[in-house]
């Protein structure tokens, strides 16, 4: 049983990239689907597909690599808030990730979004992870 599904999601993506895999399969949930959509919108993954397997479903993610150097597009996936120590922030408290080059994913009352979207809507929430 997985106690932290977001950390499991990030670890699966990180391990697949370190192993050079093109596609990674992750058990689906609504939160993981939204995080995947954000990764796609920010340009960190090539494409994704949700598959229903008559249980909870799967998310298939096509990972993105640099054409010349074969380096992964995602340099780091860092879990911030965890079950034992939740991290909340108001719009004024959002930290810049890698001097503005990265993105923080935040769970707000308006849904899961990036830190920039949360700041523009003036809502705070739980900082789930940093990606750069």
Which residue stretches match the model-derived regions?
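Core subunits and conserved enzymes of cellular information-processing
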Residues: 1-132
């Amino acid at each position: 049983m997985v106690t932290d599904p977001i950390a499991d999601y990030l670890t699966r993506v990180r391990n697949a990239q370190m192993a050079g895999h093109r596609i990674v399969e992750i058990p689906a949930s609504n939160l993981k689907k939204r995080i995947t959509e954000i990764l796609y919108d920010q340009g960190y993954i090539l494409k994704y597909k949700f598959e229903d397997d008559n249980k909870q479903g799967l998310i298939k993610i096509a990972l993105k690599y640099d054409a010349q150097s074969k380096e992964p597009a995602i340099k780091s996936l860092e879990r911030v808030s965890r079950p034992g120590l939740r991290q909340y922030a108001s719009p004024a408290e959002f930290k810049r990730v890698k001097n503005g080059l990265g993105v923080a994913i935040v769970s707000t009352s308006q849904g899961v979004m990036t830190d920039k979207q949360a700041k523009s809507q003036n809502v705070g929430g739980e900082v789930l992870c940093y990606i750069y």
